Amino acid sequence: MSGKLKITQVRSLVGRNEKHRRIVRALGLKRMHMTVEHTNNPAIMGMVKKIPHLVTVEEV
């Protein structure tokens, strides 16, 4: 489970649930097609699993 994840926002937040918006912001994503790197840990994976329709995830 160690390693890094590249998380990219691929869908807009317009009209989305406030909880989903907060999760995207907590991941550090501010706009469409922005990519961030995070360590692969249960907290990050939990956030990603709640918004799979808004982001893509790649292992680095």
Swiss-Prot record:
Coiled-coil stretches noted in the UniProt entry, renumbered to this chain: none
InterPro entries linked: Ribo_uL30_ferredoxin-like_sf, Ribosomal_uL30_bac-type, Ribosomal_uL30_ferredoxin-like
Any Pfam family: Ribosomal_L30
Keywords, in A-Z order: Ribonucleoprotein, Ribosomal protein
Superkingdom: Bacteria
Gene Ontology molecular function terms on file: structural constituent of ribosome
SUPFAM superfamilies reported for this sequence: Ribosomal protein L30p/L7e
S-S bridge residues: none
GO BP field: translation
GO CC annotations, alphabetized: cytosolic large ribosomal subunit
PANTHER family: LARGE RIBOSOMAL SUBUNIT PROTEIN UL30M, MITOCHONDRIAL RIBOSOMAL PROTEIN L30
Assembly: Part of the 50S ribosomal subunit.
Family that this chain belongs to: Belongs to the universal ribosomal protein uL30 family.
Protein name: Large ribosomal subunit protein uL30
Protein species of origin: Desulforapulum autotrophicum (strain ATCC 43914 / DSM 3382 / VKM B-1955 / HRM2) (Desulfobacterium autotrophicum)
